[in-house]
């Protein structure tokens, strides 16, 4: 959809939106842009897990999720992060709606590898009808990084991968993957642009590592699907642009 911007909010931004972030969203909406927000909540999940003396383990940047962890993740994403983000946006006169009952119907997922990751999903399909209905009414949908499989089981999904799938399904003009760092760093400097053909080598050489791997992989997938721009950074305007080439 023309004029659609998908914003993935993660890290510190997922706990508290800055005034600059709110102002930029307001400007885009005033200019006729339609916005979808996808969020993670790793910091809150880590805190809740720590309070319960439960271990946190990641493989290739993805959180290993036991079935018993899911209520905690739901509490963090739906009960805390998503609710707070939606309240902040609405308080700033940005009409928003947190997807709760519609989330599983919108995000269809399946296990990535249950033996390795547990209840971690990969997106199989995004049912866009409800999202399009909200966007047509000038409402910002707010999606937590969760989905359901065919058996109705809840799966934890990496928020970068989910945002990429949403952007691709809506054929958005831009995807922004917000994080706590300014962009992809090489020799302590932000790379202004990375071409899709350079990604494999930068992963092999360790320039792209840890939690940045799923961000870059989702960015590449999104660019190749026809989405105009993918930006990785700590704000809505600057960072590392992922481009086809």
UniProtKB/Swiss-Prot annotation:
GO terms for biological process: arginine biosynthetic process via ornithine; L-arginine biosynthetic process. The keyword Ion transport does not apply. Its main location: cytoplasm. Coiled coil: none annotated. The keyword Coiled coil does not apply. Its EC number is 2.7.2.8. GO terms for cellular component: cytoplasm. The record marks 8, 215 as: Transition state stabilizer. It is an enzyme of class 2 (transferase). Catalyzes the ATP-dependent phosphorylation of N-acetyl-L-glutamate. This is Acetylglutamate kinase. It comes from Streptococcus gordonii (strain Challis / ATCC 35105 / BCRC 15272 / CH1 / DL1 / V288). The gene is argB.
């Amino acid at each position: 959809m023309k004029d659609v911007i998908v914003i993935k909010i993660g890290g510190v931004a997922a706990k508290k939106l800055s005034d600059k972030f709110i102002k930029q969203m307001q400007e885009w909406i005033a200019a006729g842009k339609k916005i979808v927000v996808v969020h993670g909540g790793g910091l809150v999940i880590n805190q809740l897990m720590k309070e319960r003396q439960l271990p946190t383990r990641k493989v290739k940047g993805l959180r290993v999720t036991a079935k018993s962890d899911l209520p905690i993740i739901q509490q963090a994403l739906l009960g805390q992060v998503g609710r707070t983000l939606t309240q902040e946006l609405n308080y700033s006169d940005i009409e928003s709606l947190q997807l709760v009952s519609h989330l599983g119907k919108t995000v269809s997922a399946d296990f990535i590898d249950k033996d390795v990751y547990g209840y971690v999903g990969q997106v199989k399909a995004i049912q866009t009808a409800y999202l399009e209905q909200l966007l047509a009414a000038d409402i910002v949908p707010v999606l937590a990084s969760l989905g359901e499989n065919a058996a109705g089981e809840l799966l934890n999904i990496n928020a970068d991968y989910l945002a990429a799938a949403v952007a691709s399904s809506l054929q958005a003009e831009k995807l922004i993957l917000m994080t706590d760092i300014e962009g992809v760093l090489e020799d302590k400097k932000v790379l202004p642009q990375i071409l899709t053909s350079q990604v494999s080598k930068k992963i092999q050489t360790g320039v792209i590592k840890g939690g940045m791997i799923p961000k870059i992989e989702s960015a590449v997938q999104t660019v190749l699907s026809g989405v105009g721009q993918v930006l990785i950074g700590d704000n809505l305007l600057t960072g590392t642009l992922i481009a086809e080439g």
